[in-house]
Amino acid sequence: MSTIFQDLVDSTVIKNAVQGQFTSLVSNNLVVSKVNSLHLFEIEKIQKDESSFPLDDSLQNEFSTSIIDESQAFMETNMHLIRTNEQTTYVLRLVSQVKVFGTITEISALKGKGSNGCDLLIMLTDYAKVSTLEWDMQSQSFVTNSLHYYEDVKSSNICSSHTPTQLLVDPDSDCCLLRFLTDMMAIIPYPANEDLDMEEAAIENSKISSSYAYKPSFVLASSQLDASISRILDVKFLYGYREPTLAILYSPEQTSTVTLPLRKDTVLFSLVTLDLEQRASAVITTIQSLPYDIYASVSIPTPLGGSLLLGGNELIYVDSAGRTVGIGVNSYYSKCTDFPLQDQSDFNLELEGTIAIPLTSSKTETPFVVLVHTSGQFFYLDFLLDGKSVKGLSLQALDLEINDDFLKSGITCAVPAGENLVFLGSQTTDSYLLRWSRRTTNEEVRLDEGDDTLYGTNDAEMDDMLDIYETDESVGSKRKIAYENGPLRLEICDVLTNIGPITDFAVGKAGSYSYFPQDNHGPLELVGTAGADGAGGLVVFRRNIFPLIAGEFQFDGCEALWTVSISGKLRNMKSRIQAQYSNPELETYLVLSKEKESFIFLAGETFDEVQHSDFSKDSKTLNVGSLLSGMRMVQICPTSLRVYDSNLRLTQLFNFSKKQIVVSTSICDPCIIVVFLGGGIALYKMDLKSQRLIKTDLQNRLSDVKTASLVSPDSSALFAKLFTYNETLNAKGQIANGMNDSASETDLDIQPNHKTSNNDQMGYDQSVSADDVPEVDNTIVTEKNVSNLDQESLEKHPILFALTDEGKLKVYNLADFSLLMECDVFDLPPTLFNGMESERTYFNKESSQELVELLVADLGDDFKEPHLFLRSRLNEITVYKAFLYSNTDKHKNLLAFAKVPQETMTREFQANVGTPRDAESTMEKKASSSVDHLKMTALEVVGNHSAVFVTGRKPFLILSTLHSNAKFFPISSNIPILSVAPFHAHHAPQGYIYVDENSFIRICKFQEDFEYDNKWPYKKVSLGKQINGIAYHPTKMVYAVGSAVPIEFKVTDEDGNEPYAITDDNDYLPMANTGSLDLVSPLTWTVIDSYEFQQFEIPLSVALVNLEVSETTKLRKPYIAVGTSITKGEDIAVRGSTYLFEIIDVVPQPGRPETRHKLKLVTREEIKGTVAVVCEVDGYLLSGQGQKVIVRALEDEDHLVGVSFIDLGSYTLSAKCLRNLLLFGDVRQNVTFVGFAEEPYRMTLFSKGQEALNVSAADFLVQGENLYFVVADTSGNLRLLAYDPENPESHSGERLVTRGDFHIGNVITAMTILPKEKKHQNAEYGYDTGDDFSCVMVNSDGGLQMLVPISDRVYRRLNIIQNYLANRVNTIGGLNPKSYRLITSPSNLTNPTRRILDGMLIDYFTYMSVAHRHEMAHKCGVPVSTIMNDLVELDEALSYM
């Protein structure tokens, strides 16, 4: 069997983060690492509306008192001061996202060690591979400077092979340290440039490259530092030392809670200084007899210095001289240690797993430490000083009166992210960018500032005001307030959504379609459990975007449509997009086009056709738009271009000659571009003074143009930076005068007077006098037009992007028609920059690769960036993201584009693929007079996004967010979409309208409740508790979820008595979980009913079972089965229960129609041991009880009767059924293949797995008539097994045979098989036939993955592609893609990874240039279209979701 492993949804958990200046010397970057990807963010300061920030009552009162009464005059004028509605905040903007062929363990930063003075990124992958990465501005990615490999190092400690690793960087970036194998340390020196070899630095005209900025590394054992150092717990570098100094926490003698009466305080703490030149070390001091439960140390920045030691029950500070001071945070510390501690046991904290982050800024005199508990609680620790020494510690909880309780679970990493910024990364909840401030009390503010509470509301705002208004007399008092360490306030600036860990999932009907029982063919969605603890909930995945249709009607013969907003007044151009949805004076028109006629309707509550207008209805319409910010409407027809005023009266008419066939058009206020067949191009520009179009023939400057697009420079800050930076380097005269109108007209052969004699402009234009054109009086300045004065007096000059027949991209600034960029684009290289040329080969002639359409548009939500879109003949969309890079020779910014990886196949399936040499004949068959229909449409506002809609048989919506690159989302539509346009109405705000091939026009709303920053759209539903299992009831169309919440735990015996009473008032009770079964409606995603289990009883497994309720009729009925565990402490045996629930119909609550279902308990059976898994087998209920598996029958619909059982391995964690075949996964003994029979009842053991595995999930995989088993273990490995008694390796069928194995890097938690959809069949090229299934799986890192069976022919082709890419792809960190997928455990196969292909590597095929694609296809002996068809088939395997 041949398969391919693919990622459907990227992992979302964040394991590590680091802040630095990676992209430039003035940037503030944050790099976060997920399982196998790096995300580089830019922390940007923006202004946001204050309404988006939740304020507590106290702050609201402060803000309300700061508003000045409008009745009070200001300086005896009519002006009044009011508080602005904008507030300064920070956001994370994604710069780059790269995949890594390795599991990222840790990352860190080397300050200032890059070739341009920027920081280097240090990445630790797998177990002991250290890579040095540097940001490359031209390729917009990280490049590898060095790779250090230490996995061959052996340790004398036999128990250290699976110990965690640590990656540390000295505060002065002098060296990097890797701790691995518990007590082994690899040190990589990074000296300053002046300390490098002088002979190397003296080379003429040479610069010291960062690639050689390190010296040879060396490995030390802990015993080489000091003979007593062993069993290291934690290592940190210390601040404030000239030489790199280590703080080592270790425990040579081990103890436990049981042996505390014999051995206490076994932890030691040593300060060791390193001599990198001599590779020597010296111990400065050692502190002994520290509490045994200390597990980590935190280095405190200067000026304080020292270390903070974290234990389960205490916090201890150690200064540079070895003096200690500590506190106990619960009542048990005195029983665990004899170390002297101050009593702060009222907190009742258990600090295991707590993350500590030291913070400091210019506003605080000394650093302080923020502690984040595993429950999500915040505490902060202040150091009480006596002179320069610390005399005590003060621990305080975060004041929830001035802070939101937003964190419901623990975090995994925390890093300072700039001045007063901190980033918290988590694996169980969302990650947050926070701004912190140590606010002063209101009393202190009033004492120093009187009644002025404006500066007391927010320290960040106060500093901004001080920078503007402070005087020498006021500096002292105001700065004194800023240095006061008052209560800590945390403000959420940005959130990175996390949906992991996912432990279970179910497939059900899409929520908004769930209450139509007569329709059983609605769209499906995948619903999984998300998060942990208080951050638990559900996550809803959909592969496609389902249009929410707000209205529809049929218009026979309609082929295209447009919407345009017209106003009779000149408005502010800068806010034209927002004004379209808020200005009541705007009128929106809908233009429909048939083959030979057009129609125009006034869009409102209804569509009313416009009568008595000059709008051309006797011709087909090619494009419609507006000019002069909505004052003019433009209609482009095959034979003419027409301009209308706000009353739809014709003001200008330009006729095209009969030989001029319009290929493409683009409208961008105030310009129009028309491209004709044969390469001709014409520019029409609106003159603001006369409000008339002026035509310019660009044939002398541009020729052989295939398609073109215009984009406004005002749409993005990128173009503003490009022009602003470059204009400052020009002559002052050019800056002052610019390119005035007359000069531009002279350069472009335009007549200064507007009475043109152009033959293309017909007589109708001559009959329109200048008096008939309404003019705007700019001489009168009023309150309404004062803000528009500058915009009205200046012209906008769009940027022209043109694609020529030779495949060249030319970019012009229409302000002076200067060439900004020219390069070859036909080869689709990874980056586009000025002057780039590609080598032409005979392969490039294949018609399917020919580019036929170009579009430049903005993508994004709150932050929009320009993108270049190129479409090939078979609808393959290539997206490039614009960026700027500096040219040091010319001292100017240059425009460039970087290719965005295509994660979804937009290309259409090409039937009847010919031979590899069919390209030339296909090109010859294509008539030169044909015109390709334009399919890409820019939607300026759809929901909260700027997007691009791709029409056709496979419609797509291309979206980008602040935290993601451009993503391709298929639109669910069985009928090809012909045309689309933005549309705004009361019932469809910021939506869109489209027409399909059946002439149905539909008005759609955009689903704002979904997130679009991953490969699939998803929606996170918070339930506020841990979710352990989920099942979907298909007839009632609701979800049953097993949940658990923590409560205080009391030890009781089997009779319920409390044998241990609490005698000490300072003692407190621990927490334990108790569970319930909740019914969740997919219509509102709320809990509509619950069943509470017994105290401390938690659900472990929830499943839908169709049980046989009649032996005569064999009738089956769906039930919800639940397996639970009852844990009451180590003194009482664990018990469990098997529950059976029926979902019944009831009268819904008033106003809540979703509450029409309730849970009804059918039966409960309690047994010894936990019930870890339940499932159905051929109409019977199966439950796994430890190592025993029991099959039960439902009798009389009220009780269960056991009919068969079997003893398996140690503890059954997974059970899957396929008819009467069963597959069980054990916690340590691999999988077991079992059969079940009814007459007589028996369970037969068929076969077992060969190796001892910790199985995390397992399931069947079907390909036609072949049956296989997919097994995932806790080490992140995936195995494909088969039952083959004829194979000698199976020992006559006693052992399952391994067909392939594959390292994933994630722990798979659940999997199931889903049908594989196949729409295309081609026997010649070996496409799949028969009934195939895909194995869909979820993992603990928030990802969704799939294992897809493929035919042998497809496997051979893609295997050649994989081997080619493994040697050609420039991998991040210098890692080998093939070695990453190898499993380290022994296997009987000579080639263990055979038959499982790496989808992440094969995805690079679409990223490669066209020439490389043809080279790979040539090695396979097939055309590129065949390879692309293979990828399309795989991409559409779950197209019904």
From Swiss-Prot:
The keyword Transmembrane does not apply. Belongs to the CFT1 family. InterPro entries: Beta-prop_RSE1/DDB1/CPSF1_1st, Cleavage/polyA-sp_fac_asu_C, RSE1/DDB1/CFT1/CPSF1, WD40/YVTN_repeat-like_dom_sf. One of its GO terms (molecular function) is RNA binding. Its main location: cytoplasm. The keyword Nucleus applies. It is found in: Cytoplasm; Nucleus. Residues 753-763 have a biased composition (Polar residues). GO terms for biological process: co-transcriptional mRNA 3'-end processing, cleavage and polyadenylation pathway. Coiled coil: none annotated. Signal peptide: none annotated. RNA-binding component of the cleavage and polyadenylation factor (CPF) complex, which plays a key role in polyadenylation-dependent pre-mRNA 3'-end formation and cooperates with cleavage factors including the CFIA complex and NAB4/CFIB. Involved in poly(A) site recognition. May be involved in coupling transcription termination and mRNA 3'-end formation. It comes from Schizosaccharomyces pombe (strain 972 / ATCC 24843) (Fission yeast). It holds the Pfam family Beta-prop_RSE1_1st. Gene3D superfamilies: YVTN repeat-like/Quinoprotein amine dehydrogenase (2.130.10.10). One of its GO terms (cellular component) is cytosol. This is Protein cft1. Keywords: Cytoplasm, mRNA processing, Nucleus, RNA-binding. Residues 741-763 are annotated as: Disordered.
